[in-house]
Amino acid sequence: MDRKREPVRALELFCGIGGFAEAACEKADVVAAVDQSEIALSVYRLNRPSTPVKGFNLETVSPAVLADFNADMWWLSPPCQPYTVRGKCRDLEDSRASSLRRILSILPQVRPFSLGLENVEGFAASEARNLLVSVLKSCGYRIREISLCPTRFGVPNRRPRYYLFASLGELGEMDEAKISEYSMRDFLDGRPSPELALPPGIVERFGRGLPTLDPDDRNAYAACFASSYGKALMHSGSYLVHNGGLRRFSPDEILRFHGFPAAFKWPPKLGLRKRWHLAGNSLSVFVLRRALSILPHFK
C-alpha cells in the first residue's frame, strides 16, 4: 500500500490574501504567512484561521527568524513595482526591492530544500532576477524558469507572469492539462451590484478608449487586472458591456478568474476599493497549482 506523502512545510512570504496557500491545497502545511499589509493579513486570517500570520518588515528580518520556521519550502511573491513601466523600472534601486534583497542575503545561511517565486514578466530581464539566480546557483539549487498565463489553461484572463522554481533535489515536468474550456459568463456574478456601473459621463468621454468585453463573446479575454483597478480608469483591467452601458468587474469576479474558491470571504467592513486592490495584487491559483507540479513535493 502506498503511504500518503506528508505535506511540505511551507513559509509563505509576501503572502497577500493567500494565493499560494489556495494553490498548494493539502500538499503544503503553511507554517507561517508573512506580509507587511495588515489589511491583507486580515483577509488571510478570515479564510485560514489556523495558519499563523506574521505582520513584520522583511527588509530587516534576521536569519534566525526565518530559520526558526523550519520550513522545507519558501514561497515568494515580492512587490512587482520595481519591474514595471508604471513603477519606473528602477529594479534593485527601488526601495520596494529591499525586502527581496534581504531574503536573498539570508538564503545561503538557511537553505530551504525548495523555493518558488512569482512576479511580473519584467522581472525576467531584471537585475533582481540575475541576483536571485546567482544566489541560488551558488547554493547548489537546480532552477527552472517559465512564463505562464491563465489563457494557456483555458481561463479567459490575460495575466502573464514569470515563475521560478528551485530545488536542492530533482525538478519535474509541469502538469500541462487544461482546467476547462470556460466562457466569460462562468466567472460573472449572477446579480452584479449597481455600484459597479460606470457613470454615463465617463462612458461617453472615455468609453472608446477602454478595453470592453461582451459577456456573450466566447472568444473574449479579460485584460490583466491591476491593483489600481477601481481607482485608475485606464490600463488597470477590462470593463463589461452591461445594461446599455459599461461596468467594472467585481472583486469576487476577479478572484474567480484567479481560481479562488467560492467559499473565499472578505471582511464585511472592507471597502470595495480595498477589495479590488487586494484581488488585483494576488496571483492566479489556477496557474500556480499546475506550476507547482515542477517541485517534487507537489507531484
Describe each region flagged by the PLM:
Residues R9-L11:
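Conserved beta-strand elements of the Class I
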Residues L13-C15:
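Class I SAM-dependent methyltransferase "Motif I" SAM/SAH-binding loop
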Residues S42-D68:
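S-adenosyl-L-methionine
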